[in-house]
Amino acid sequence: LFRFCEDLLLAQEQGGVLGEIDITKALENHSLVIVPCLNPDGVQIALGKDQPPPKSAPGSPWQANGNGVDLNHNFDAGWELLHKMEEQEGYIGPGPTRYGGKRPHSEPETRAIAGFCLACDFRRVYAFHSQGEEIYYEYGADTPNRSRLMAEVLAASCGYKVCRPEKIASHGGFKDWFIHTMHRPGFTIEIGRGKN
């Protein structure tokens, strides 16, 4: 992602192209907004530079924020259904992953990015997560018609698979909220190999 940003800025500065796209012309009427990290506290914990919250359950590698809430389970898109699934799987309080909080948008990071999207009225979003080489594009009946084609074009450009999120990963995420709320295309791109 950082390499892409560097290439994009260099192409714009030099009046060049990137992937056969004239960047200067493309950015005349379009904007590209990049939020490099929505969860800096969680990253610090995952890297061992900070301690997890005192009452958090031990276990999986750390994916949650500093409060032990998994931000990709905290958005108001099927949150109640997701919360029941979390409880059935034993995620009942703060921990390293899959606990969506006491209510949707309970976390400052969730509220910040949702408010930012509403204020800026984005046409689409791309959320980059780590591991899986997969692209998710749908959220039930709210999925815009052109989303599948857009996901297939993305997949063809990078060799990833277009997939459907399952079970506990099928609600409460940023992409889900954006599609549900804005009625526009949203994508989660699982970059890199491996599993969470």
Locate the predicted segments by residue.
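Active-site/substrate-binding loop(s) of hydrolase catalytic cores
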Residues: L1-P144, E152
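Catalytic cores of processing enzymes, dominated by hydrolases/peptidases
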Residues: K102-R103, E134-N196
